[in-house]
Every structure is written in structure tokens, then in C-alpha cells.
Amino acid sequence: MSHKIAAVCLLMSCLIATAYSAAKVPISIYYESLCPDSAKFITEQVYPAVKGELRDVVELTFVPFGKSQFVTQGSEVTFTCHHGPNECYGNKVHACAIEHIQANSYQVEYTRESLTMDFINCLMKAGKNFPDNVYPGQRCASENHINNWENIKTCANSTEGSVLLRKAGESTMRLKEPLTSVPTILFNEQFDKKVNDRAQVNLVGTICQYVSAPQPRICNQHNGASTPSLASVSAILSSLLGLWFIRSFY
């Protein structure tokens, strides 16, 4: 009997621990650096959400390619971008920033993820309005504690930038449902048009549908969650295991 009790306790502990370890919601954002809709979504939906109460429950992946295309000839890669050559350069800057931005060990409040988010948000806010046609990379780096702008710029102007942008393109082309609009948002690496459309107007509410309990307080404002909470899952598991435990004696 004691062995059975120990087995039940161990199983419940493993199941609950697994649920907690998978708490972060994976979100992939496929976008273009000079796309107005991408800019609106990132600056008005993504940035406020992940810089607020939801920052610890999401895992963001940015894929800066969108409807661009590329052709490879030998070692050369030629890109054609939805909003012209400036967007190709912007996409490369984004790809290089995602690759190269590092946390500052002397400023622990600036994590790699938060620095990347701040930098991308700044670039997207600038949109197509560059004073004197100067791309705002250096300004956004300076304003957001990015200490290695020169590395990012060198990457964007070199073969490395082309390689990283091609990887973003390959990732975009591997989507099960071909990308037809920008931005496109995936939750848990799965595309669902209804979820995508809802996320673009209410990202916080959509994220909360995927967050296990205990949820951040902001989720209390969004009561349409369709995903069972961790507490609900634990209760169901406890009931099922309890039934199994009782029946094992008969």
C-alpha cells in the first residue's frame, strides 16, 4: 500500500512540475521592418504587453522577413523586399540585432530579451520617417542601452546579414500555412487564423488564454480564456489518480 501511495505522489509531482516548466507561452511574430501594420502591432500591442505584467510568461521569437523573396546564386543572395531596398536593409538590421544583442552584466535589469524588444520597438516607431534619410539604428541603440551597435551595423552590411535574413526567409517559407499577410502571429508554433486575427487587436487577452494559473492580474480583465488553467488540470489529475488509487484495492 505504501508503495502505491508513493507512486501516486511521485506521478502527481512529475505532472505538476512538467506543467510549471512549460509555463511560458511561445509566440512567433513574422513581420517586415517598414510595414505600417507590423509597426502598429509591435508598438501598440506587443511592446506594452511584454514590458508589463506578461513579460515573464511569454517567449517571443521575431522573424523579420514577411513577404520578401530571395534568390541564391552561388554564395550571393539577392533579396527583394515588400517595401523596397530600404526594408531589406532594415530587415537585416533586425536580424542582426536579434543575433548580436547581449545583456549588460553591469545592468542586470536589462536582459537580452528586454534590450532586443526595446530596440525593435524603437526602430518600428520610426517607421519610414527617417530624418535626413538616416536609418535610426544608431539612435535607437543609444537610446536603449545597446552597447554594440557597431557590431550590428557591420553584420547588416556584410555577408552575415544576408545569411541571417535568408534564415528568416527560410523560417517564413516553412510555415505550414503560407504567409499571406503581415504581421502573422503563431502561438505554440501553430498558426490559427482566428487566433492571429484576435491577437492583432487584443494581444493581452489572447496571451491570457494560453497562460496557466496563477495568471497575472491583468488577465482578470479578460475572462474568455479557453485553455484550462494549471489549477484546473491539477484538480482533474488528482481526481483521476484518486479513482485509480481506490480501484486498485478492489
Curated annotation (Swiss-Prot):
This is GILT-like protein 1. Belongs to the GILT family. PANTHER family: GAMMA-INTERFERON INDUCIBLE LYSOSOMAL THIOL REDUCTASE GILT (PTHR13234), GILT-LIKE PROTEIN 1 (PTHR13234:SF69). It is found in: Secreted. Involved in the immune response to bacterial infection. Glycans are attached at residue 157. InterPro entries: Interferon-induced_GILT (IPR004911). GO terms for molecular function: oxidoreductase activity; oxidoreductase activity, acting on a sulfur group of donors; oxidoreductase activity, acting on a sulfur group of donors, disulfide as acceptor. GO terms for biological process: immune system process; positive regulation of defense response to bacterium. It comes from the Eukaryota. Residues 1-21 form the signal peptide. Conjugated to URM1, a ubiquitin-like protein. Disruption phenotype: RNAi-mediated knockdown in the fat body or hemocyte of flies infected with the Gram-negative bacterium E.coli results in an increase in bacterial load 24 hours after infection. GO terms for cellular component: extracellular region; plasma membrane. The gene is GILT1. It holds the Pfam family GILT. Induction: Up-regulated following injection with the Gram-negative bacterium E.coli. Up-regulation increases between 1 and 6 hours after the injection, then expression remains at a relatively steady level until 72 hours when it is strongly up-regulated. Keywords: Glycoprotein, Immunity, Secreted, Signal, Ubl conjugation.
